[in-house]
């Protein structure tokens, strides 16, 4: 990127927008089943489960942002809250909810808006539910690179 006196230029910003709109979307994991994330069991409702690695470090080698979470499977009828984290410090970058009940199976692509994540960052996730029964969610992520 071009900088004048160390400051971002209008050209820099236009380039980022151009790349965002015209680069192809990606999915992770690709050509594989989604990653399973599990809620806690026996520690209380709406308590986040253990962090699970969705995208390992050094996998996405360009800056990126996440636009959708693909919910591939939900284990039980419940409300699920998913939290995404990035980097070694596990900084929260997004949070969404999905419901599975007698009328909705909960499998869908949920829009999410994350900040631009640094290249080579890992992405981890955790879920919570009101049931406290160890529910699971299988997910993959749709993202764009810059």
Question: What annotation goes with each model-predicted range?
Answer:
Residues 1-146:
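Beta-strand-centric surfaces of beta-sandwich/beta-rich domains
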């Amino acid at each position: 990127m071009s900088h004048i006196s160390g400051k971002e230029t209008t050209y820099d910003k236009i380039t980022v927008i151009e790349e965002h709109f015209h680069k192809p979307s990606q999915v992770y994991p690709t050509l594989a089943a989604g990653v399973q994330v599990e809620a806690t069991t026996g520690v209380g409702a709406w308590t986040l489960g253990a962090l699970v690695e969705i995208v390992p470090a050094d996998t996405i080698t360009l800056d990126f942002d996440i636009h959708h979470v693909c919910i591939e499977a939900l284990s039980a009828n419940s409300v699920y809250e998913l939290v995404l984290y990035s980097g070694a410090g596990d900084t929260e970058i997004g949070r969404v909810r999905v419901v599975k009940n007698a009328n909705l199976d909960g499998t869908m692509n949920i829009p999410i808006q994350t900040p631009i994540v640094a290249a080579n960052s890992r992405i981890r996730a955790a879920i919570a539910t009101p049931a406290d029964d160890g529910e699971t969610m299988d997910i993959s992520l749709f993202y764009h690179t810059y």
